[in-house]
């Protein structure tokens, strides 16, 4: 076999009889030198909680070395110096790489809403004879070479039921078809110019289609009309993907990133060591916070970590005071600890809990019964939640920038008109949740029955209890008939027309309040899609509705 190969190379003019490379061979090899590399580092790394609140995933350290620096050094070792790093989340922390390694940073500001296919779309002109990889890999040995003769994608010999590809008899990667376990996909690839250009054309089409907002770049590589790509197989464990806190701990228990503030808080509150904190799972990303589930000494808990900019939005001392008032009353979730300085909160996990379905009349009826029961406790705290003060405050956080809405000044003036009307209305002045939205009503099966617990009391304060009805409606994005149905669920005895009009006014005011809140969060890179638009529409539409009802009432009185 070897002799046959040698003779073939000599026959083609690549080897001399003295077994030395010919000039023709050197010219051919020069054509197959990798030109550049792309490292995808824009995403949140959501499963890396709690580390990702402080450090982007590419800068996680193993044995004192950031993951992305190890990849860059391995690329430099094979003489690949032209490196593009696509950044987004905490992009500023990657800037030092420009000075240290001469990399080029490419910014993808869509990282919060779209997957890494859209990051790759930012560097399509650079693709061709290119290494492509995510930033969160740790390679024991250098997976790169000075010469590459064909396109390949790196997989391990481990079988993975979630993988969409498997290695064929020709050592090509083909769809697993769902019938067989595929090979574990690692994410590193080498793309020759023909394969790269073919894939780039597909990506240009895919990014125009919202159906592909959440897909990985591999969907473009392995498309049905794509060129075949060879498999490059490494043993299981040769490349370690670090997607979770526990994976990092397994690889390097002394990593500095394991010493996060959130983990230190858990250790302090529960009097445990870090090794006793296991089963860490990210929960859904909230509108204000990020939370994760964990196990410790047989119990399950949730750690709440405040999100971007919340220190300007929420008074954590006031939140702690609310929880002290609620303690032992069976109204909220069971609080283990709340830190009034940084907002870290630990609660016991409610097994089997589900949130209210705002489209289910039985759920809504049960939630309104719970809400009214809470209001009728007539609890009190020392602070209030002023709707109009908060509207002005959220606007002040824009730091002089105009609203994104052209008619904001008119809309704001209309909403402020409602202030005098609301001031004159009778109120049920009590501790009010303020954020009594469907997602904050938890249904819990307990002792053969169902309990409802209200969670997330960050905004709670003294206010008219009927504000909570308005908040439920606008978060659920109810139309007018649904709003009226909810009001009727709360007022089982019947709702006086003047109270109904007052609630409509609260819908207008609260709509502008949360619209301003969304505008501030948008300036931090956090977007809420249709929700923000609907809040602004509530401000406009329900102002008009209130004005019509008041005019009709005045006409009847005359």
What is the predicted role of each segment?
Residues 3, 17-37, 184-268:
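Conserved alpha/beta core of the MobA/IspD/sugar-nucleotide pyrophosphorylase nucleotidyltransferase superfamily
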Residues 15, 140-216, 220:
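Conserved core of the sugar-phosphate nucleotidyltransferase
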Residues 28-91:
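N-terminal glycine-rich phosphate-binding loop and ensuing alpha1 helix
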Residues 94-164:
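Conserved beta-loop-beta/alpha segment of the NTase-like Rossmann-fold superfamily
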Residues 252, 258-260, 517-558:
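ATP/Mg2+ or Mg2+-diphosphate-binding catalytic cores
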Residues 262-276, 379-434, 444-446:
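An alpha-helical support segment within catalytic cores of ATP-dependent transferases
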Residues 281-387, 402-410:
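ATP-binding pocket architecture of kinase catalytic cores
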Residues 466-495, 508-526:
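Active-site activation/catalytic loop segments of kinase-like enzymes and analogous catalytic loops
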């Amino acid at each position: 076999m070897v002799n046959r190969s040698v003779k073939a190379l000599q026959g083609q003019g690549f080897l001399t009889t003295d077994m030395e490379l010919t000039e023709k061979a050197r010219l051919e090899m020069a054509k197959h030198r990798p030109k550049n590399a792309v490292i995808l580092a824009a995403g949140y790394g959501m499963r890396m909680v709690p580390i990702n609140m402080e450090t982007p995933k590419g800068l996680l350290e193993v044995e004192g070395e950031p993951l992305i620096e190890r990849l860059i050094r391995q690329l430099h070792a094979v003489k690949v110096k032209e490196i593009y790093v696509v950044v987004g989340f905490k992009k500023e922390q990657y800037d030092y790489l420009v000075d240290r390694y001469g990399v080029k940073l490419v910014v993808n500001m869509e990282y919060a809403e779209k997957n890494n296919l859209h990051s790759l779309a930012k560097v399509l002109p650079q693709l061709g004879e290119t290494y492509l990889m995510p930033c969160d890999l740790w390679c024991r040995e250098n997976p790169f070479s000075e010469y590459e003769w064909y396109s390949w994608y790196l997989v391990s010999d481990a079988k993975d039921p979630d993988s969409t590809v498997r290695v064929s008899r020709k050592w090509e990667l083909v769809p697993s078809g769902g019938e067989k376990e595929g090979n574990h996909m690692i994410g590193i690839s080498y793309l020759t110019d023909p394969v790269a250009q073919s894939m780039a054309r597909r990506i240009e089409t895919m990014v125009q289609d919202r159906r592909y907002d959440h897909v990985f770049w591999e969907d473009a590589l392995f498309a049905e009309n794509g060129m075949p790509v060879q498999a490059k197989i490494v043993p299981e464990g040769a490349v370690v993907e670090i997607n979770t806190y526990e994976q990092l701990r397994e690889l390097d228990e002394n990593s500095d990133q394991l010493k996060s503030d959130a983990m230190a808080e858990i250790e302090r509150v529960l009097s445990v060591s870090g090794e006793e904190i296991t089963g860490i799972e990210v929960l859904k990303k909230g509108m204000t916070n990020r939370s994760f589930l964990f196990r410790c000494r047989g119990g399950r808990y949730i750690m709440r970590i405040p999100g971007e900019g919340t220190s300007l939005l929420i008074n954590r001392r006031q939140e702690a005071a609310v929880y002290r008032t609620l303690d032992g009353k069976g109204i909220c979730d069971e609080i283990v600890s709340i830190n009034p300085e940084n907002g870290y909160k630990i609660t016991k996990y409610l097994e089997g809990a589900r949130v209210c379905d705002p489209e289910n009349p039985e759920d809504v009826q049960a939630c309104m019964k719970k809400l009214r029961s809470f209001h009728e406790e007539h609890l009190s705290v020392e602070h209030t939640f002023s709707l109009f003060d908060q509207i002005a405050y959220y606007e002040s956080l824009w730091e002089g920038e105009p609203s994104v809405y052209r008619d904001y000044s008119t809309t704001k003036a209309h909403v402020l008109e409602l202030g005098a009307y609301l001031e004159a209305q009778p109120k049920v002045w009590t501790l009010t949740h303020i954020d009594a939205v469907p997602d904050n009503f938890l249904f819990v099966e307990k002792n053969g029955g169902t309990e409802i617990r209200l969670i997330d009391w960050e905004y709670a304060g003294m206010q008219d209890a009927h504000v909570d009805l308005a908040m439920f409606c606008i978060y659920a994005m109810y139309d007018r008939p649904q709003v009226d149905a909810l009001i009727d669920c709360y007022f089982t005895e019947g709702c006086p027309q003047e109270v109904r009009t007052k609630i409509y006014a609260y819908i207008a005011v609260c709509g502008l309040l949360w619209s301003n809140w969304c505008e501030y969060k948008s300036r931090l890179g956090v977007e809420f899609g249709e929700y923000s638009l609907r809040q602004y529409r509530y401000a406009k539409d329900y102002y008009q509705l209130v004005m019509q009802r008041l005019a009709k009432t005045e006409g009847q009185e005359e």
